[in-house]
Amino acid sequence: MIKIIDRTLSCLDNFSIDADSLKKLMLLLLKLNCDKLEISEKVYQAIKPLPPKEKFILRVHDICDLEKYPEFKEFVCESVHIDGDRRICKEFQMNSVGEMDQLGARTTTERIRLSGLDDILLSDYTNIFKKLKNVLKGPIEFCPMNRMKCATAIAMEWAFASDNAEIVTSFGSLNHYVPLEELIMALYMHHCPTNHSECRYFAKIRDLIENATHVPFAKHKAVIGKEIFQVESGIHVDGIMKNSLCYEPYNPELVGQKREIILGKKSGRASLTLKMKQLHLKLSELLLPQILQQVKELSIEKNDCVSDQEFIQIVNDVTRMNSIGAFTAKVREG
């Protein structure tokens, strides 16, 4: 059994985001069916009251603040010096595998959130996992960091090595935690129990966070990047038309995106054929070489792809010039 605790709503305190956007984000995150959502005190004050019958965890900076929030049953805190309170999950950071020896002296609560361990894949991680479970007798919320861009792989290894894994994520790897969208898709691709219909909200969540924080995600970021389903190469387009699994492990629609054929210097006849079909353009295949040549020349001149409007203009120009040429030839023959 794999449980996901998402902390996206506790990663936004450094941004000035209006309450309406925060509420919309919360509702979209709830649609992803995570087991729990972590929320910061600042965000909670902006969007309260929370929906009933949902599982929220409140992140507090001081253990003394717990009594201010009787409506919460679970808390997470980095500075805990009290033992025996089952409401509290103590989070502590292990920046490297070399800090394993300090583990025993720092476990003072029954539930532990372990963050960090970016470099664990460089070591014998299976034995390290066993040691962690032997030292930490209680439940472990595992929160590998993503500074080395392999947190999803670490989380998946932990999940497969545990009977009841609890993994902490953030959407888009905010604050360098396990990317929620990558973990959900990894579980889906490995046929783990998950509701794939939740994935269609990824693009909406991405757009909402980008608009609210004014910080865009990388265009080629796994799962949610805006350009990951853009295809320019003629060979790739031809392969996708025959069998999309040649280049795409899943359909773009599954994650709320669409495949887009990009015309440029790497395009081929297959690209033009599919683009004309998408734009409902009809013309003789004899004109494709001329059109393709102009597409490549324009792309090189712009140092960018050719837009649909520019492509339509090229098609119209080539068609018109060939019509004029054909008419002139007939006149000469006459």
Predicted features, each with a name:
Residues 3-6, 58-63, 81-82, 92-95, ...:
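Active-site pocket-lining/capping segments in soluble small-molecule metabolic enzymes
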Residues 1-17, 131-138:
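N-terminal small/glycine-rich loop or linker at the start of catalytic domains
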Residues 23, 31-123:
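Active-site beta->alpha loop and helix N-cap motifs at the rims of alpha/beta catalytic domains
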Residues 21-25, 124-128, 151-154, 179, ...:
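General structural feature for long, well-ordered alpha-helical segments within catalytic domains
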